[in-house]
Amino acid sequence: WIGYKEGMVDLPYWAVVNLLRGILSPVCRIEVRGTREVPAGPWILACNHLSHFDPPLIAGAFSLPIDFLAMRELFQPAWFGFLMRSCRVIPVGRKQADTTALKTALDRLRSGRIVGVFPEGGLRAGKTSVLEGAPLTEGVSLLASRSGCPVRPAVIVGSDQLYVARNWLRRPRVVVAIGKPLHAPLRGQDRKEWMARLAEEMRSLFGEVKRAHRLEEVVLPKTPQERWKSGR
């Protein structure tokens, strides 16, 4: 049982994470790289986003709780929103700057938490993904500069294979890896330049994962539509 030392506030989080790990572990092989050695918060986790399976797979790869940001639409219906908030998930609007979400995330960091963000702005693969050269959204740089907390780049590869039901029978590989921390932007520093550096760190980590884990072509990121069309 992971997370038993974290206190009462995280009991719902670990109950859900361990339940989902129990469901997903029989249908995929989860490989981790560096996730068990990370320090306690405050810091920010910035990861690419391939599929709806990413949050539980990422959470299950770490031995510390992560307070993820998730789009507000996922908090409906009301009972599911209650479950999400019980797991410390922070709702965020995507159409305009969400000052409430920013304040909540800053408060979590001040209290020593780890905040997880998907700075691509949604599910991305191919040319729209940071892993293939696309830019990141500005939210992560704003959160880092306001909090002064370091950002650790992370990469998940293979989770998109789970969109094809028959893949569950062959237990596809899913890799979750984390890189070295990147210091928050300094006051007056060009945030776009800082985001470009973070994006490059994520791409470099992706390259390391491909080499170290000898990933086959079928494991490399695809859109859900590409997965459904190929049946793999």
Give names to the regions the model predicted:
Residues 1-37, 57, 78-87:
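A transmembrane-helix-recognition feature enriched in membrane-embedded lipid enzymes
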Residues 3-12, 100-232:
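Non-catalytic C-terminal accessory region of glycerolipid acyltransferases
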Residues 9, 31, 69-70, 94-95, ...:
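A generic secondary-structure micro-motif detector
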Residues 19-20, 86-92, 122-127:
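Short, basic, glycine/proline-bearing loop/turn elements
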Residues 25-32, 96-99, 157-160:
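Short gly/ser/thr-rich secondary-structure transition/capping motifs
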Residues 28-30, 64-66, 87, 113, ...:
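A structural micro-motif
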Residues 34, 70-71, 88, 118-119, ...:
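A secondary-structure boundary/capping signal
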Residues 37-96:
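Catalytic core of membrane glycerolipid acyltransferases/transacylases, capturing the structured
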